[in-house]
Amino acid sequence: MVSETKTTEAPGLRRELKARHLTMIAIGGSIGTGLFVASGATISQAGPGGALLSYMLIGLMVYFLMTSLGELAAYMPVSGSFATYGQNYVEEGFGFALGWNYWYNWAVTIAVDLVAAQLVMSWWFPDTPGWIWSALFLGVIFLLNYISVRGFGEAEYWFSLIKVTTVIVFIIVGVLMIIGIFKGAQPAGWSNWTIGEAPFAGGFAAMIGVAMIVGFSFQGTELIGIAAGESEDPAKNIPRAVRQVFWRILLFYVFAILIISLIIPYTDPSLLRNDVKDISVSPFTLVFQHAGLLSAAAVMNAVILTAVLSAGNSGMYASTRMLYTLACDGKAPRIFAKLSRGGVPRNALYATTVIAGLCFLTSMFGNQTVYLWLLNTSGMTGFIAWLGIAISHYRFRRGYVLQGHDINDLPYRSGFFPLGPIFAFILCLIITLGQNYEAFLKDTIDWGGVAATYIGIPLFLIIWFGYKLIKGTHFVRYSEMKFPQNDKK
């Protein structure tokens, strides 16, 4: 039998996120250290053409995923997002595993952001103990989420605005350098696409390897689905925000990568260094310095600190809301379903803060091996969440139509069904399974490295099938699916 799914809009959450908040979450959600720091490594490994093609391909995949999520979130705007859709339209245990894995992923990611924050601050204050900065930033992130959802929304709006402004200025400076208007700048142009093995250095294998990095860079775009549960007029604002995704991908990622590749040759050894500790070799910093802007390192340090805080702020919000929704559905202790007068799930916030703090402490005072395994177990979760979105949307639309509902009644309709979710699922699956494909091409396989890379997959399957075995659930048939908005009519 199919257990009764109790997932509805969680009572008590305040719909205080306005259209401008959602738009900035959609635009700035995935602009972070992946673009500001790690993008140089993609050009170095795959060449300018290979990196650009990888960003365009993964960007197309993410666009399809966001249109799928947009259709689901506009129709059923709940904070459980894809975990809710997974249990309603795929299988209850599937949604259970998606929810717990996503909460755990962000709790660990907050700890990673705390480590990154202290590394960034050490650039300015090398003699100050790093844990002081991490504790300070954890306190700031906690307070932004403690007061109200509007506090999170406002902080994320301004964080994202800083990141977006930086990318726009970067693109303008880059274009001026390329066309020769920026006086005193080092020469730039298409010559960097013809040196050595460019434009496709390393061939197809290098592009596959780069796709992994690019995929991680885009993670965070799905946050808009969770924010839908506290959005004003989600049927109107969610589609508007989702439509921004295509232009964000085109402008902020593709144009930025193109400009970097035209100004800095892929053979520049600085591009391979992608440690947030050394801002001076960020590809953005290198381009600004090529333009004669010698203070670029200090500016980019501040921007990257903003990106780290933004990631931590978003992670705290996402994990808190996911834990709250799990509790409302009876899939986590009920204590986490309690709300403050302002509509904030503070018990869930306390728990997430404690877990994130403990994970951080393992990196500081505990066994580094423990910390690395915690990090590795969460590494796959973003890709698993994307797979869950594609599967849930495909089955949602199929069930919706088979039950006789008119797709024109949907608040937002993905225009590429079924090709969009199918393409996104296949490509995301290839990226997920190909994370460490090089290990299997060597004479001796490093099984420890393989286990560290893929541990997130069996962990997800154990949670899923463990729940399925205990509860006796099965895949939801199309005829059994519930469509609450239509049922209300």
UniProtKB/Swiss-Prot annotation:
Record Pfam families: AA_permease
Topology Periplasmic: residue spans: 44-45, 127-128, 183-197, 266-290, 368-370, 435-446
GO biological process: amino acid transmembrane transport; L-lysine import across plasma membrane; response to amino acid
Effect of D275A: Retains 88% of wild-type lysine uptake activity, but can hardly inhibit CadC. Cannot interact with CadC
Subcellular location: Cell inner membrane
Top-level taxon in the UniProt lineage: Bacteria
Effect of W106L: Retains 20% of wild-type lysine uptake activity. Increases the capacity to inhibit CadC in the presence of lysine
The entry's keywords: Amino-acid transport, Cell inner membrane, Cell membrane, Membrane, Transmembrane, Transmembrane helix, Transport
Effect of mutating E438A: Retains 14% of wild-type lysine uptake activity. Is unable to inhibit CadC
InterPro entries: AA-permease/SLC12A_dom, Amino_acid_permease_CS, APC_YAT
Induction: Expression is repressed by high external lysine concentrations. The HTH-type transcriptional regulator ArgP is the main regulator of lysP transcription. Under lysine-limiting growth conditions, ArgP functions as a transcriptional activator by binding directly to the lysP promoter region. In the presence of lysine, Lys-loaded ArgP may prevent expression of the gene. In addition, expression is activated by the global regulator Lrp under lysine-limiting conditions. Expression is not affected by pH.
TM region positions: 23-43, 46-66, 106-126, 129-149, 162-182, 198-218, 245-265, 291-311, 347-367, 371-391, 414-434, 447-467
Cytoplasmic side: 2-22, 67-105, 150-161, 219-244, 312-346, 392-413, 468-489
Coiled coil: none
Family statement drawn from the similarity comment of this UniProt entry: Belongs to the amino acid-polyamine-organocation (APC) superfamily. Amino acid transporter (AAT) (TC 2.A.3.1) family.
Role of this protein: Permease involved in lysine uptake. In addition, functions as a lysine sensor that mediates the lysine-dependent regulation of the transcriptional activator CadC. In the absence of lysine, or at low lysine concentrations, LysP inhibits CadC by an interaction with the transmembrane domain of CadC. In the presence of lysine, LysP loses its ability to interact with and inhibit CadC, and acts as a lysine permease.
Protein name: Lysine-specific permease LysP
Record organism: Escherichia coli (strain K12)
